[in-house]
Amino acid sequence: MARHPELLIPASSLEVLKTAVIFGADAVYIGGEAFGLRAKAKNFSMEDMKEGIAFAHAHDVKVYVTANILAHNEDLPGVRKYFEELREIKPDALIIADPGVFEIAKEVCPEIERHISTQANNTNYGTYNFWYRQGASRVVSARELSLEEIKELRANIPEDLEIETFVHGAMCISYSGRCLLSNYFTGRDANRGACTHPCRWKYAVVEEKRPGEYLPVYENERGTYIFNSKDLCMIQYIPELLEAGIDSLKIEGRMKTALYVATVARTYRKAIDDYQKDPELYKKNVPWYLEQISNCTYRQFTTGFFFGKPDETTQIYDSNTYVKEYTYLGIVGEVKDGLCRIEQRNKFSVGETIEIMKPNGENVEVQVEKIFNEDGEEQESAPHSKQVLYVALSQDAQQYDILRRAEKADETKALCE
């Protein structure tokens, strides 16, 4: 049996961190308010980070903080101050791409482990060994590596140097995520946390001798999403991932909702545990894993580079829209006197049938019986996003349960290929 892997889940906020922890993460990675390459994510204040780390550690879950900016000179003083603050709240590791930032981390907080981000283009065992000699304890493999290449890596690096690999989520069209399109089109630097995702826009080809004549690609007169990748999904290949010697299975998505994080964490948790317990049970349950994971809000799936270089089926040429099966309504907070406190995320009404998604076990269909606002006034619906409400359901819910509503599918979902 292969080694027991870590399940590493993203979190965009304190609420999502707690969701990841409760729904099965072994470790969570988060970003602060600077230097983490997710300027549009909610990110964590130092106070939220401190609370999140304490919550995770109380549940025996680790927390890694991203500092994977490709720094300019002007960034370095702020990086130093940031690491001085992080030293006090004791995350389990820093995720770093820039050698200059790495050196500052070694100097300021040597007791915190240093992981090398995929942004550093980690494609060969020479690179892994270099970072090991510098003091890194883990390297995140480039998304461009195949399983065979990862096996070769494992055989040529120290046993105590960990390999972390993205196994699920969005794929960047650029090499190891180092995109220049956003900076070129909008002046917002993807390598400094401000990507505008131009890979999801439509494009047409122009031949230099025919200015003004826009040539459609794949016969789409409005252009094509030629840079628009499907999402990575490797849940049906857990055995292959573990046999390759991967230590940490990483889920992409530091800008995703709590519903997405709960669904992916719970499903991958069960898949890993099933395989470790009984490989035959895992094989039997693969259709269930795929059904559950496809209920999130995301695109069609691909296996990326794991089994060789992707072909044209990896791209989505006609759309950048998301497949959607469930609408996220909120997370159950305190439960008292039969009322669930929630901060509502999407509209729902009295009399509707919704689902309670639990960390363990089956989902439960319930009726919304009553809705009260913070003043105790009864209302028929929850129309305002982020309104704090107290909701009576036809069956009991527990703190950290997810409330969601099933929607009619607009299209047939494509599962892993």
Enumerate the predicted regions with their spans.
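Gly/Gly-Pro- and Ser/Thr-rich, intrinsically disordered tail segments characteristic of DNA damage-repair
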Residues: 77, 112-123
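Surface-exposed amphipathic alpha-helical tracts and adjacent flexible/coil segments at the periphery
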Residues: 1-11, 16-22, 27-30, 34, ...
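Conserved phosphotransfer cores of two-component systems
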Residues: 109
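Alpha-helix capping/helix-boundary segments
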Residues: 100-101
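Short beta-strand elements of ligand-binding domains
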Residues: 65-66, 96, 116-118
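Glycine-rich, positively charged N-terminal anion/phosphate-binding segment
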Residues: 38-55
